[in-house]
Amino acid sequence: MKKEMTTFAAMSLMRYYRKGTVRKINKWLGKQPTDPYMKFKEIEFFSELLTNLQPVRCLEYGSGISTPFFLKLLPDNAQWHSVENLPKWYDIVKAQLTSDRIHLHLVDAKEDPNQEAATDVYANFAEQLEGEFDFILVDGINRENCIDVADKYLAKNGLLVVHDANRVQYHSHIKQFKNWKIIQDFRKTAGGFGLASNDLDLEKLVSWNEHSQAWKADTNISNFFKFKFLIGGGKPFKLEHS
């Protein structure tokens, strides 16, 4: 079993690193990326999650040009609402969107760690969209507030996903839900996912064992080549759950 796990992780890493190299070459050549601005292990994780969940009504805090990439994985009747607070970035994203199933919303709000969740117009913008959501992605500003108010906007069997869950300040907020999982790698300020729901069985959403093998191997390799193991600064792979 150990040999099989090692083989699986090695094959996954080869795939991730190959795609990462192509992305860097294309960036050097000035080509506009079409894949999400995530590490490829995160793209595969997130893609499998959406494919299995098949949400119809989606809400995203923090818009991105990668939204059409993920929309292709959803049902034909899926609608994706994206909330953005930066006018210039809003214009950039809007200019590249062609699907009438993606709805971009500009909200006058700023990052404010002292803003209370109940009065946060950014976190509570979902009230203006009416109805509940099958899926909510938190990847913008005031993330703690967005997590704290998410439950009142989630439909039955709805799922909350928090990107950059390597940031420990999000963990206590994610853990307020009945069911939660947090997968982390070697990074401290970016990457990682937190999943939460009061209804869903999170075990069935992705192949946790397989992804854990690959994420752990990637973390070990990164810590080694950055010599973090010598100075005690290496951050280990971690998968926590409720």
Where are these regions (language model features)?
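A short alpha-helical cap/connector motif
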Residues: 1-135, 142-155, 159, 165-242
